[in-house]
């Protein structure tokens, strides 16, 4: 069966209510404990939604706001929104859900404009498995113009914040602790991602702005602190492995970040031929396996690596690689890299 279903409503407002699903099985026709579809004006405030057998709160074509509510113990995601038309998800606590925290999805790539701000998301599992579909604190999928800011996200099986094919995306001012895989991920066919002023402490990889092979490009990665990364993740790693501070590929600037304790690479620039127009300047990298690795495969595009401080990189400060294999000596030791696409200068190595 179901607890609360509404469709084609002009105005629904829920305030100060407790919805407890008691972990009961739900009917196949319903998406969540509260299942609200095509709501022209939705306001949910100061509610508790707990123990859902599916999603806690499931929204389809919703416009409005969800705020100051507590959502916990969902068998799927805490909040699942699809095809929203201007939604604000603000000041909520989402915890102890089996597959996801706050999901902002669309059926096709389009503008979405959901704002996910000031929420606490914690202890999100990936009970249904996979390599990233589940286990994320905040997830934007095919949704453009989404803002994810000022959230505190901890103890997620995969990513604290994960965006797939989400263009014109802002991820800023979030605190991401103890992520099982990549803490902040912008992947697949996105165009335009600003990832700035976030704190990442504890993850397999820190921040990834990747998948130029799928058309993923155009990013700014600045002012982040990324530290205490691990070489182990929730599944056997693809090459080159886990333990990378920041990874970028195309049309992206990486500036003024501080990376500490990245056991594989402090920074990874490009993967095989998937490298174009990357500038990495003014970063500090401490205690890394290799400070910065950059692709030197035939077909790799322009990269400028300058004015960085690299302190305590065990396997070299700046090293050219062919995919996962080192192909050069330490490029930081002279200004001539021997590669036309690559400028490495004025880096301070200690």
Where are the regions that the model predicts?
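Small-residue (G/S/T/A) turn/hinge positions that recur once per unit in extracellular repeat modules
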Residues: 9, 39-40, 62, 85, ...
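Short, contiguous acidic/charged loop-to-helix segments that flank catalytic cores in large enzymes
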Residues: 185-187, 209-213, 241-248, 268-272, ...
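Leucine-rich solenoid repeat scaffolds
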Residues: 312-321, 327-350
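Low-complexity, intrinsically disordered tandem-repeat tracts enriched in small residues
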Residues: 149, 196, 203, 219-222, ...
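Short glycine/acidic-rich loop motifs that flank beta-strands on beta-rich extracellular proteins
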Residues: 1-3, 23-30, 53-60, 75-83, ...
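Extracellular beta-strand solenoid repeats
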Residues: 5, 13, 35, 43, ...
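Extracellular beta-strand-rich solenoid/capping regions of secreted or surface-exposed proteins
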Residues: 1-15, 20-41, 56-61, 107, ...
